[in-house]
């Protein structure tokens, strides 16, 4: 049975706990995960903190649509998407995407697809705190190019 967990909130998550839930199903031979973290630098500047904002309700709906599209393309078991919001510090986790499937090819492709679409289609906004002041982070052309290959 296919199961999906989508969580958006300020709470930190534990990668091991998320992996354990994904890996419970014996019918899935592949578990692929990605964890994104706050870097201490961006665009040549030091980053002291990162604040993520979102559009409540719309963000979760967008993430559910991305997962549904992935399920339409690949045979998937469990899928987890966790995205933090609020203020975070370098080294803290921002995002977790976990995908299971019977085979690794589907799991790798679906995980990459979900992450590429999340970066370009989900309504999140990033603001970095640097020694020079706060600034909004613009979307990157490389993220758009990655999503366009799907």
Language model features by range: what are they?
Residues 1-94, 102, 106-112, 116-150:
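N-terminal, polar/charged subdomain of small-to-medium soluble alpha/beta proteins
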């Amino acid at each position: 049975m296919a199961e999906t967990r989508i969580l958006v909130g300020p709470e930190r998550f534990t990668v091991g706990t998320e992996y354990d839930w994904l890996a419970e199903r014996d019918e899935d031979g592949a578990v692929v995960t990605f964890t994104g973290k706050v870097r201490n630098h961006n665009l040549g500047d030091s980053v002291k903190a990162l604040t993520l904002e979102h559009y409540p309700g719309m963000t979760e709906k967008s993430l559910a649509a991305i997962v549904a599209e992935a399920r339409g393309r690949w045979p998937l078991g469990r899928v987890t998407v966790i995205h933090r919001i609020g203020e975070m510090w370098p080294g803290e986790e921002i995002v977790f995407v976990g995908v299971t499937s019977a085979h690794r090819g589907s799991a790798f492709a679906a995980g990459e697809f979900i992450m590429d679409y999340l970066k370009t289609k989900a309504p999140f906004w990033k603001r970095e705190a640097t020694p020079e002041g706060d600034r909004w982070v613009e979307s990157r052309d490389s993220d758009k190019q990655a999503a366009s290959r799907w």
